[in-house]
Amino acid sequence: MSEQQPLPTLPMWRVDHIEPSPEMLALRANGPIHRVRFPSGHEGWWVTGYDEAKAVLSDAAFRPAGMPPAAFTPDSVILGSPGWLVSHEGREHARLRAIVAPAFSDRRVKLLVQQVEAIAAHLFETLAAQPQPADLRRHLSFPLPAMVISALMGVLYEDHAFFAGLSDEVMTHQHESGPRSASRLAWEELRAYIRGKMRDKRQDPDDNLLTDLLAAVDQGKASEEEAVGLAAGMLVAGHESTVAQIEFGLLAMFRHPQQRERLVGDPSLVDKAVEEILRMYPPGAGWDGIMRYPRTDVTIAGEHIPAESKVLVGLPATSFDPHHFDDPEIFDIERQEKPHLAFSYGPHACIGVALARLELKVVFGSIFQRLPALRLAVAPEQLKLRKEIITGGFEQFPVLW
């Protein structure tokens, strides 16, 4: 009798932070769903097929990531926190999402275009004025989304370093391993910050998200605690993911100079370039996906999944599904566009899609014109990935120009 093979273990890190994991590609080639072992030691399933991932993400038979069964509940104050969208589902989730959705609509985001461009231009100038090598993370990828989300929400630019640091701490160890005490404290501090800003907005309302949330409270659409949680969640989500995508996108352009030259030669390709960056390096590219929990026994691609199992939807892995993308391992900014799952899918799809795309288009539409010789100051493998944070990104991103 042959010995049972050990289960593949997650996470499966990229090679030099850029190339897809060979283990992931080999596993993905064997089908769209796989039995795996998670860092916590629990066993479960990893969905790597594009169609199968969409099916899970849109199926009400699965609980969202923020509503795990008791056996898997991590020690985190965020789970179950009022207004934290991933901790709500069904009508409650739809009610809360409808409150913040207008702030991230195409109309509201279009009003921010000039402001985002001005913020980016200022940060490009600040970066260019630094002695070389300089940390692009400190001077561009970290502050830009923080300053943009502060404009959308109606909080002071001067506060961006404060709440960006808190959002960083909140997202630390929100996967399955590691201590969470600092994360809990940061979440409560962030909520206290939001409460104070909401009190200020009572006296000085304006066209921004905090004012919208106060109106929702006054109209009985949300409790004050739900409004605070929604605002805090938007600050975190509106900042963390884009930081990593700017950094991964630049890495991809450095790795593929011909693609960079195409973009510089034809700036109209920026929309396609951003979509290819999103496909290859979706939010959480440093991790393996987002969790779901079936309420009852289900079947995925012929695989029986018992109720309350861990089912990780591998958003980054779905980008390499050859049944959906031609030559998926090739980074090609002129790729024939097909929908990807960078922003998830279904009722819990990312609400800030338009804003994230705008930020990335502004950065990649002008950074190589502003800094034509921009390049890494170290080898890619020397960059230190923030493995403890689910959105990924790097501790520092030293560049020359």
Curated annotation (Swiss-Prot):
PROSITE patterns: CYTOCHROME_P450. Its EC number is 1.14.14.-. SUPFAM superfamilies: Cytochrome P450. CDD domains: Cyp158A-like. Heme binds at residue 350. The keyword Metal-binding applies. InterPro entries: Cyt_P450, Cyt_P450_B, Cyt_P450_CS, Cyt_P450_sf. The keyword Iron applies. Keywords: Heme, Iron, Metal-binding, Monooxygenase, Oxidoreductase. One of its GO terms (molecular function) is oxidoreductase activity, acting on paired donors, with incorporation or reduction of molecular oxygen. Its cofactor is heme. PANTHER family: CYTOCHROME P450 BJ-1, P450, PUTATIVE (EUROFUNG)-RELATED. Belongs to the cytochrome P450 family. Cytochromes P450 are a group of heme-thiolate monooxygenases. They oxidize a variety of structurally unrelated compounds, including steroids, fatty acids, and xenobiotics. This is Cytochrome P450 BJ-1. The gene is cyp112.
